[in-house]
């Protein structure tokens, strides 16, 4: 029916025999006037209402962020106070607002001129070649994180300059830049490197590394000891075992893996602590921590550490002793004279027993 109406046929009401009567392909000329639309709520290019944008209120404080001034300066000047703007076809459209732009668009503009009295770059990322540490310089003065608002993103000019410059500065330039009186500095300890836990350990309590000789068949254990005098807690870190003898092949014993059992004598609670069972080899690596609580300074001098390396039996098999040793506990501890005093050192102490 729609196709017939488009072709010029219409229903004939005068002749009942003929249901369809042809009409002219061109309809009669209508009277001049605004056309009536069946859907007045649909926006078409020939019908766009006039939008009104209220003027921007002046800032009472007078302090506008630098990123906001930069984005507003690149936009259309004096457009926010106009009711609308007319394009080439005469259509009304909304002006571009900095609040509706994506954050990535801030990096595509030309480098702006730096404000007077402000440094060119206030936060830098340094990459050191040996261990690829990413750390933030201590002179960064960022007020808020970049994820809090789109205006917290770095300026586009700074990012472009940072890419074009070489990867690192020479020691002479770095020292001259650090000693400049105009370079801002923030009081406080330096920020530790990201993705690196070794730097955090150097600011903790001093530790002592020891090597315990095993008998009777040889081998040794590597330990790292740390003591907290406040809670009376002793931490023993079992690093690895080296040079362990091969387990003797006996029927009904061994074959389940290697483990280390640590015990303080005279006995304290817990009586003994056992490491996880690893694959039996000549140099197994454990990297486990053992904690003994309730040990005051007088108790440390009266106790000793006993360590046994076992080849665990699988199923109903018996354990096989690979080596054992016993050492006075006071010989494994770091100096207890005051942690970070002038006479103490943060460097680990090596001891071979």
Swiss-Prot record:
Residues 140-150 have a biased composition (Low complexity). Residues 135-191 are annotated as: Disordered. Signal peptide: none annotated. InterPro entries: C2_dom, C2_domain_sf, C2C4C/C2C4D. Residues 217-343 form the C2 domain. This is C2 calcium-dependent domain-containing protein 4D. It comes from Homo sapiens. The gene is C2CD4D.
């Amino acid at each position: 029916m729609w196709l017939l109406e488009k072709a010029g046929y219409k229903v004939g009401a005068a002749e009942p025999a003929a249901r369809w009567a042809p009409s002219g392909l061109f309809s009669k000329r209508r009277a001049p006037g605004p056309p009536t639309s069946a859907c007045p709520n649909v926006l078409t290019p020939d019908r766009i209402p006039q939008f009104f944008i209220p003027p921007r209120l002046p800032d009472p404080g007078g302090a506008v962020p630098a990123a906001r001034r930069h984005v507003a300066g690149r936009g259309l000047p004096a457009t926010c106070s106009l009711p609308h703007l007319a394009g080439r076809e005469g259509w009304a459209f909304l002006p571009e607002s900095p609040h509706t732009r994506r954050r990535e668009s801030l990096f595509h503009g030309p480098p702006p001129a730096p404000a007077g009295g402000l440094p060119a770059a206030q936060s830098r990322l340094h990459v050191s070649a040996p261990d690829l540490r990413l750390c933030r310089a201590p002179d960064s003065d960022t007020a808020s994180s970049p994820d809090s608002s789109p205006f917290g993103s770095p300026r586009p000019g700074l990012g472009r300059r940072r890419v074009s410059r070489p990867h690192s500065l020479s020691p002479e330039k770095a020292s001259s830049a650090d000693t400049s009186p105009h370079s801002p500095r923030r009081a406080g300890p330096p920020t530790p490197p990201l993705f690196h836990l070794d730097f955090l350990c150097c600011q903790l309590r001093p530790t002592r590394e020891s090597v315990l000789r095993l008998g009777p068949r040889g081998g040794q254990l590597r330990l790292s000891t740390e003591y907290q005098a406040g809670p009376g807690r002793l931490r023993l870190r079992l690093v690895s075992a080296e040079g362990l003898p091969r387990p003797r092949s006996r029927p009904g014993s061994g074959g389940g893996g290697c483990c280390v059992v640590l015990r303080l004598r005279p006995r304290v609670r817990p009586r003994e602590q056992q490491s996880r069972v690893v694959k039996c080899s000549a140099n197994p690596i454990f990297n486990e921590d053992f904690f003994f609580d309730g040990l005051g300074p007088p108790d440390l001098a009266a106790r000793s550490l006993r360590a046994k390396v076992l080849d665990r039996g699988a199923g109903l098999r018996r354990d096989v002793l690979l080596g054992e040793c016993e050492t006075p506990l006071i010989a494994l501890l770091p100096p207890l004279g005051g942690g970070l005093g002038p006479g103490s050192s943060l460097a680990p102490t090596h001891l071979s027993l």
